[in-house]
Amino acid sequence: MEARRYGPNIIVTGTPGCGKSSTCEFLKNKLKDYKYYNISDFAKDNDCFEGYDEGRKSHIVDEDKLLDMLEPLLRQGNSIVDWHVNDVFPERLIDLVVVLRCDNSNLYSRLHARGYHDSKIEENLDAEIMGVVKQDAVESYEPHIVVELQSDTKEDMVSNVSRIVAWEKMWLEQHPDGVTNEYQGPRSDDEDDEDSE
C-alpha cells in the first residue's frame, strides 16, 4: 500500500439534492488527473450492500466492505469523493471536506423532481435545516478542513469549484513532498515540550 500521497483527497458532501454530483462534474473537468468516486455508484458496482431499508426505499451500504475497497484507492491521493455520508472515511486520508448547503425551496424542487416520496423529502429537508451533514463533518474531521459552501445555482457551483481548485493549488504548494497515509497518533506532552524549546 502507498505510504505517501502527493495529491489531496476531497470529499464533496451534503444533503441529497444539494448539488454534489453536479459540483463534482464541474470539479473533475478542472482537476483532470483526479479520480472521481460517486459512492452510491461505487457501492452498487462493487456490491457493497448489506440489505435494503423498506421504509426509506434505499439500500443499506456495508461501510466496512466499502472502506476495504476504497481505502487503497484513497491512499493514492488525487481523489474526489461524492457522498452524503462523510464520517466513514479515515481522517488521515482526507484533506478537505466540502459541505454543500441548499435553500430548502430549491432542495424540495430537486428532490420532488427526482421522484422522492414525501417522507424522504421531509427527512432530507429536516437534515438540511438542522445542518446534520455539517455537524457530522465537524465531529469526524478536524474543523479547519471542513468548509461550508452555498449551492443553490449553477453560478454558486462554478464559484465553489473555483475555490476548491484554488485550495488544491495551495495544498500542493504546501506539501511538495506529499503527506503520509499512516496514522500518526496524538502528540504527546513530551513532543509539545520539545517543540517549545
Curated annotation (Swiss-Prot):
UniProt superkingdom: Eukaryota
GO biological process, one term: cellular response to oxidative stress
GO molecular function: adenylate kinase activity; ATP binding; ATP hydrolysis activity
Region (LID), start-end ranges: 113-123
Pfam families: AAA_18
This protein's record includes keyword Secreted: no
Residue numbers of Phosphotyrosine PTMs: Y183
Enzyme Commission designation: 2.7.4.3
Cross-referenced SUPFAM superfamilies: P-loop containing nucleoside triphosphate hydrolases
Database matches in InterPro entries: Adenyl_kinase_AK6 (IPR020618), P-loop_NTPase (IPR027417)
A GO CC term assigned to this protein in UniProt: cytoplasmic stress granule
Subcellular location per the Swiss-Prot or TrEMBL entry: Cytoplasm; Nucleus
Catalytic activities: AMP + ATP = 2 ADP; ATP + H2O = ADP + phosphate + H(+)
Keywords per UniProt: ATP-binding, Cytoplasm, Kinase, Nucleotide-binding, Nucleus, Phosphoprotein, Ribosome biogenesis, rRNA processing, Transferase
Residues bearing the modification Phosphoserine: S188, S196
Region (Disordered): 176-197
Family listed: Belongs to the adenylate kinase family. AK6 subfamily.
Family matches, as PANTHER family: ADENYLATE KINASE ISOENZYME 6, POS9-ACTIVATING FACTOR FAP7-RELATED
Assembly, per entry: Interacts with small ribosomal subunit protein uS11B/RPS14B. Not a structural component of 43S pre-ribosomes, but transiently interacts with them by binding to uS11/RPS14.
Other facts noted in the record for this chain: Present with 8350 molecules/cell in log phase SD medium.
Record's function text: Broad-specificity nucleoside monophosphate (NMP) kinase that catalyzes the reversible transfer of the terminal phosphate group between nucleoside triphosphates and monophosphates. Also has ATPase activity. Involved in the late cytoplasmic maturation steps of the 40S ribosomal particles, specifically 18S rRNA maturation. Required for cleavage of the 20S pre-rRNA at site D in the cytoplasm. While NMP activity is not required for ribosome maturation, ATPase activity is. Associates transiently with small ribosomal subunit protein uS11. ATP hydrolysis breaks the interaction with uS11.
Protein name (record): Adenylate kinase isoenzyme 6 homolog FAP7
Protein's organism: Saccharomyces cerevisiae (strain ATCC 204508 / S288c)
Origin organism lineage: Eukaryota, Fungi, Dikarya, Ascomycota, Saccharomycotina
Chain's gene name: FAP7
